[in-house]
Amino acid sequence: MKVGIHPEYTAVKATCSCGNEFEFNSALGKDSIHLDVCDKCHPFYTGKQRIVDTGGRVDRFNKRFGAIGSKK
């Protein structure tokens, strides 16, 4: 690696909105950042995710507008 061209690599403290704090190394240039979601509060990782059923919307659309295309 060339000397003097790489950014400084420092420890960064991340604080989540749920209160979880952790440190990681980065060339970000800041000493702390605020996160909205982390692995401790994200629904995918906590097992509290909801599955959104969009089939009802398609059925409603077909009921409202499906007959328009079949008229001749």
Swiss-Prot record:
Entry GO MF terms: metal ion binding; rRNA binding; structural constituent of ribosome
Any single biological process term in GO: translation
Among Pfam families, the record links this protein to:
Ribosomal_L31
Q: What positions does the entry give for Zn(2+) binding? A: 16, 18, 38, 41
Instruction: Give the keywords, sorted.
Output: Metal-binding, Ribonucleoprotein, Ribosomal protein, RNA-binding, rRNA-binding, Zinc
Q: Which cofactors is this protein said to need?
A: Zn(2+)
**InterPro entries attached to this UniProt entry:** Ribosomal_bL28/bL31-like_sf, Ribosomal_bL31, Ribosomal_bL31_A, Ribosomal_bL31_sf
Q: Which GO terms describe its cellular component?
A: ribonucleoprotein complex; ribosome
In the UniProt record, does the keyword Ribosomal protein occur? yes
Q: How is the cofactor bound?
A: Binds 1 zinc ion per subunit.
Matching entries from NCBIfam families are given as: L31, PRK00019.1, PRK00528.1
Give the family, as the similarity comment puts it: Belongs to the bacterial ribosomal protein bL31 family. Type A subfamily.
Could you give the subunit structure recorded for this chain?
Answer: Part of the 50S ribosomal subunit.
Outline what the protein does.
Binds the 23S rRNA.
Q: Provide the protein name.
A: Large ribosomal subunit protein bL31
Q: Which organism is it from?
A: Aliivibrio fischeri (strain ATCC 700601 / ES114)
Phylogenetic lineage: Bacteria, Pseudomonadati, Pseudomonadota, Gammaproteobacteria, Vibrionales
Gene responsible for this protein: rpmE
